[in-house]
C-alpha cells in the first residue's frame, strides 16, 4: 500500500545541484500545498517526505513516501508551459529534510544537455505509477486486514525500518496506518490485535516488529 521507489539515482548529481536552490525543512512542515502553482521541481537530498491528498472535510489519505534521491512535484513539467494545472497533492517533510528546488524551465534546459537526468525522473515516475496501480487494486480487492498487512510489509522496506532478531522493526501510529489504507484508527487497532494473536507481529505503542521479514 505504501509507494516505495527503487529506481535509478542520478550519476551526476553535482551537475543538477549546481543549478538548484537548497532548502531545509523541519519534520512535519509542508513543502507543497495542494492548489499551488506548478513551476518548480524538487529533489530530496536528505530525508524523506509524505505525499498525501485531502478531501473537502479535511480527511487525509497518504499516497506514499519518498526518500533521498527521489524527485517530486514533476507533473507540471510535462504540461504545456503556461498551462500547468495546480498541485494535486500535499507534500510534507516526514523527518528533517534537505531539498533541492529547480524551475521547470531550467530543468528542461539541463535535460536537453544530459538526457540521463530526464531518464532518471521518468524511471521514478513509472515506478510510482506501478505502485499507485497496485494501491488502487488493493483498495478494491483486499479487505482491511489484507491492506494493513501489505502496508506493514511495505514499511519494512523503508530506509527508517530497523533490523530485529525476529524480523524488521518499524515505528508508525495507528492513525497513520489508517490514513494509508483508508480506515479508522480503531479498525487498525483491531487488525493489529488480530495479527498479533496470529503471531505475525508484536506491537507496543507505535513500535511494531513484523516477524519473518528481512
UniProtKB/Swiss-Prot annotation:
PROSITE patterns noted in UniProt: CNMP_BINDING_1, CNMP_BINDING_2, CNMP_BINDING_3, HTH_CRP_1, HTH_CRP_2
Entry keyword Ribosomal protein: no
Any one GO molecular-function label of the UniProt entry: cAMP binding
GO cellular component annotations of the record: cytosol; protein-DNA complex
UniProt keywords, alphabetically: cAMP, cAMP-binding, DNA-binding, Nucleotide-binding, Transcription, Transcription regulation, Virulence
Occurrences of domain HTH crp-type (ranges): 142-214
Effect of disrupting the coding gene: Mutants show loss of twitching motility and are defective in type IV pilus assembly. Expression of ExsA is also strongly affected in the mutant.
Stimuli inducing this protein: Regulated by both cAMP and cGMP to allow differential regulation of different regulons. Cyclic AMP is required for Vfr binding to vfr, regA, ptxR, and cpdA promoter DNA. Cyclic GMP instead inhibits the formation of Vfr-DNA complexes.
DNA-binding region(s), chain positions: 174-193
GO BP terms: DNA-templated transcription; positive regulation of DNA-templated transcription
Binding site for 3',5'-cyclic AMP: 59-60, 73-75, 87-88, 132-133, 179, 185
Keyword DNA-binding belongs to the record: yes
Pfam families (UniProt xref): cNMP_binding, HTH_Crp_2
Subunit structure, interactors included: Homodimer.
Function: Global cAMP-dependent transcriptional regulator that controls virulence gene expression by distinct cAMP-dependent and -independent mechanisms, which allow to fine tune its virulence program in response to specific host cues or environments. Controls the expression of many regulatory targets including type II, type III and type IV secretion systems, flagellar-mediated motility, and quorum sensing systems. Transcriptional control is exerted by binding to a well-characterized consensus site (5'-ANWWTGNGAWNYAGWTCACAT) within target promoters.
The name this protein goes by in its record: cAMP-activated global transcriptional regulator Vfr
Organism: Pseudomonas aeruginosa (strain ATCC 15692 / DSM 22644 / CIP 104116 / JCM 14847 / LMG 12228 / 1C / PRS 101 / PAO1)
Lineage: Bacteria, Pseudomonadati, Pseudomonadota, Gammaproteobacteria, Pseudomonadales
